[in-house]
Every structure is written in structure tokens, then in C-alpha cells.
Amino acid sequence: MSKKKVMVGMSGGVDSSVAAAILLEQGYEVIGATMQIWPDTDEETKLVEGGCCSLSAVDDARSVANKLGIPYYVLNFKDIFEKSVINYFKDEYLKGRTPNPCIACNRFVKFESMLNKALSMGIDYIATGHYAIITYDDNKKRYLLKKSVTQQKDQTYALYNVTQEQLKHILMPIGNFTKEQVRAKAKELGLYVASKPDSQEICFVNDNDYGKFIEENTDKEIKPGYFVDTKGNILGKHRGIIHYTVGQRKGLGIALGKPMYVVRIDAENNTVVLGDENEVYSKELTAYDLNFISIDKLEEPMRVKAKIRYSAKEADAVIYPLEDGKVRVVFDTPQRAVTPGQSVVFYDGDIVVGGGIIQ
């Protein structure tokens, strides 16, 4: 019987390197690949060094592939990355929302474009170094996405968009490992990326300065406007709505004699609404662009744990189906800084139920 083939998305980091090594040990025919996402200009030097697809990432991934003795490719996904990740990121900020580009990249680049490329090459699976577990439920006849064994590293929040058809062709071999075990495994294999630090920032934004990135990469005018309170009274001037996000207190550039927080961003009127901290809390939200994994669709209210951003703790909530395919999420206790444009992900224990984008 011929070996099953798997293309591993290699970022040059320790997680994807060890994922490739584990699959080799498990008897797969492994092919390494790094996504080329930067334009053909000097722009590529602007990618965050050490980021998941920078030039040094390609060098690191190639040397790991050589060490493991596997073929290695660099795949060109520049156009889809620009359209589905960078342009989406800019457009959302210009609309006064706060997007999560890593979720868009997973959805449109890794698990759509890269998977389709692999399948077109006659490869059975793609694999990544994500901390998550994929299983198959014989009773439900569905693939399930579950949290990794290590809660601090769990990455299921950014993976909720994967479909049943995609899950059939995805492997995530390090979901049962802790970060320490992954680093130890890399060391044991003699991979020099064993001690490489994790990438933290958005790969195409230097110094995490989103506002500066958008100003430099849009032809739209970033207009200053007014800070207003929740009653509409003018409090002062802001530098442009792209510089603010819900819940923000620092860096507002306005002194009001007491701490004030961004409560809402009104793109239509180019205003940033400020309020006291208690005004930043919300008991409910509406989500759209839903994807469900453990169920086919939401037909009746369901009790879940809901997570409103990557760094947030899960909170008890009930989700209700709405007629237009959206979902209403009602929390047991008010949540701080529910932010339009971010994703909300629903859990049932360690199982990902699904998720959507906050309206």
C-alpha cells in the first residue's frame, strides 16, 4: 500500500517543524511548504522578521526540511493574501471595526488555497503546527475540532472556520503535546529552531502599529474627527478612527480628568464615543458569517462557553438562532469590550461548536 501524502505548512518555527517530524515518524510521505505572501517589491523586507512568512522563515523552514530529508516548496499566495487578509484588515479598520487577520489567513489562505493546491497535486492531507486536536465522531458522523492538551497554547479560537470537507484533509499532529514537549522533541531531533521564540505580532504590521500601516497602505483619506460622550457632547478631537478600538483607554491623546474608555466607534459620523468603564460592558452581542463544526446548524437555543477574543476567558452564555442566519449571544454576566469585527467562538467543554464575527 502506498504511503499517504501530507503537505506540511512550515513557518520556520518550532511547532510546524516538529509537526513535520512527527508525521514522518508516523509513516506519511511528507512534503514541506511555506506560503509566500509578500509582494515582489522591497515590501518583503518590511515583513516582521521572525514572523510566520518572512524571508528568514523560508530559510529556517528550508533548512529543517533538508535536515528531515523531505522535499520543500515555496508556494505563491501573494494575491489571495493581499485580497483576503491585508485588504480585509484595512477595510475593517476604515469601517471602525477591529478585525483578526490571523483568522482570515487560516480561513482563506491556509485551509482553502493551500489545501486546494495540495489536493490538486495529488496530496491527501495538509498539516499545520497548530495546537488543536481533530477527531471523528462515529455517532454524529462529523469531524470535531477540540482544544489542545495545553490550555495556554490552545489555538482553536483562530480555527473555528474550518469546514467538515476541509477537516477530512487536515492533520494537526502537535495538539496532544505541550510547548515544552515540542521544544524537547525539536532538540532531540537536532533541529536548530528548537529554541526559536514564538512569533507574536501580526506578520505584516511592524511594531504592532496598525494605524501607521493603514495610513501608509490606503489611498483613502484618514480624517480627524471628534471624541463624543455617550450623550453626543463633543469632548475633543481624534486622529482618525483607525487608531482606536473598543475598550481602549491608553493613547487616546485627550485629558478629561478621569479615565475614559472607547465605548463605540461610529464610522458613519467619524466619531469615537467615550464613556466610563462600566459603559464598556455588554450583556449580549449579535454574530454573523457563522460556521458550525460540532453541529450542522443552530436550530434551538444552546448553552455554551463563548470567547470574544483570542486573549479573553471563556464566559457562560446561551446562543439563539436568528432568522437571517445570524446568532444572538446572551452572556450570564456582562463582558468587557465586546468588539465589532472580532470573532466570537463557542465551546461545549473542549469541543468547538462554531463561531462567527461580532456585528
UniProtKB/Swiss-Prot annotation:
Residue numbers annotated as active site: 105 (nucleophile), 203 (cysteine persulfide intermediate)
Q: What is the lineage of its organism?
A: Bacteria, Bacillati, Bacillota, Clostridia, Eubacteriales
Assigned EC number: 2.8.1.13
Reaction(s) catalyzed by this protein?
A: S-sulfanyl-L-cysteinyl-[protein] + uridine(34) in tRNA + AH2 + ATP = 2-thiouridine(34) in tRNA + L-cysteinyl-[protein] + A + AMP + diphosphate + H(+)
Q: What is this protein called?
A: tRNA-specific 2-thiouridylase MnmA
Record-marked site positions (Interaction with tRNA):
130, 342
Q: Does the keyword tRNA processing apply?
A: yes
User: Where do the record's region annotations for Interaction with tRNA lie?
Assistant: 153-155, 309-310
Pfam families given in the database record:
tRNA_Me_trans (PF03054), tRNA_Me_trans_C (PF20258), tRNA_Me_trans_M (PF20259)
| Keywords in alphabetical order | ATP-binding, Cytoplasm, Disulfide bond, Nucleotide-binding, RNA-binding, Transferase, tRNA processing, tRNA-binding
Q: Which organism is it from?
A: Acetivibrio thermocellus (strain ATCC 27405 / DSM 1237 / JCM 9322 / NBRC 103400 / NCIMB 10682 / NRRL B-4536 / VPI 7372) (Clostridium thermocellum)
Q: Name one GO biological process term.
A: tRNA wobble position uridine thiolation
| Gene it is expressed from | mnmA
Q: Where in the cell is it found?
A: Cytoplasm
Give the molecular function GO annotations. ATP binding; tRNA binding; tRNA-uridine 2-sulfurtransferase activity
* Chief location category: cytoplasm
